[in-house]
From Swiss-Prot:
UniProt keyword annotations, A-Z: Electron transport, Heme, Iron, Membrane, Metal-binding, Mitochondrion, Mitochondrion inner membrane, Respiratory chain, Transmembrane, Transmembrane helix, Transport, Ubiquinone
Record's protein name: Cytochrome b
Organism: Artibeus concolor (Brown fruit-eating bat)
Keyword Glycosyltransferase: no
MF terms in GO: metal ion binding; ubiquinol-cytochrome-c reductase activity
Cellular localization per UniProt: Mitochondrion inner membrane
GO cellular component terms given for this protein: mitochondrial inner membrane; respiratory chain complex III
Purpose: Component of the ubiquinol-cytochrome c reductase complex (complex III or cytochrome b-c1 complex) that is part of the mitochondrial respiratory chain. The b-c1 complex mediates electron transfer from ubiquinol to cytochrome c. Contributes to the generation of a proton gradient across the mitochondrial membrane that is then used for ATP synthesis.
Family from the record: Belongs to the cytochrome b family.
Amino acid sequence: MTNIRKTHPLLKIINSSFVDLPAPSSLSTWWNFGSLLGVCLGVQILTGLFLAMHYTSDTATAFNSVTHICRDVNYGWLLRYLHANGASMFFICLYLHVGRGLYYGSYMYSETWNIGILLLFAVMATAFMGYVLPWGQMSFWGATVITNLLSAIPYIGTDLVQWIWGGFSVDKATLTRFFAFHFLLPFIVTALVMVHLLFLHETGSNNPTGIPSDPDMIPFHPYYTIKDILGFLIMLTALATLVLFSPDLLGDPDNYIPANPSITPPHIKPEWYFLFAYAILRSIPNKLGGVLALVMSILILAIVPILHTSKQRSMMFRPLSPCLFWLLVAVLFTLTWIGGQPVEHPYIIIGQTASVLYFLIILLLMPMISMVENYLLKW
């Protein structure tokens, strides 16, 4: 008798995706982050759903409703901090996942890669709108500053900003719509994740060597299911440790002050996971130029496959490219640090140098070094 998991219309989809899926035998821990992102998304949707049951999206009561969740709702503090720090874990896994793709040449699967970029934008938009909801000082001023950037768009900019705000400033209408979109977007993200996986399973996974692994495949279950479960346990332990021991470590103290349109905080900055892009934005003195650089800092990932000049897919066996890759990582850490600093000397020039280096490495140095490596292969 044929196994039900191979014949049932629903079970056979799950079976071909998570049980009998042929996977390369050489996948390292870097391939764990896709499944970890799935767990993060699940945690965020569940905690967010329960938080939404107690939250009110009104400027008069939003801040107090979050306080009420933490003080009066059973385990409300746990839900709130799991959700806030879960977002941080989400972005850690997201950046490591993208970094893995860059290092091992996974971007050569262009459909999967492009859906991934869409996912990155969607998750960033979701996180930004979520940060506005507690209606603290940094929520209000972050929303004001970031949405106001759209006014740099010629002709339609000002109208666009007022349309997003629902008025002439960030107010009740803005908060209500941000809550609606913050609730909706994770489900759109979930749908995009399914499309992402659909395209991935069309080609099969890449592997650390970058060499086709068709002759050497193993079933996903039990090998990679066990490996993924270990990853879940490590990540959830890290998240629980963060939530239970220092839940406010990655947050901003200013967000415990209720939003006040008449008092500007000394340093307006987004959450840590946006600081690298914020530093690039601030490093350009022109408003429109800054906005374009901000968008390009993420959108540049879309042209990485076009800039691939190496004869080898992965950086595993390339002598020079990994040095540039780790320099890029160092530049991103520098930008993250600069994004959290005030706009003054020497931070301005460090930010500008790091921003130029970021684009230079991806657009020019990586393709050039790859061509040098191709030449070295002939020796």
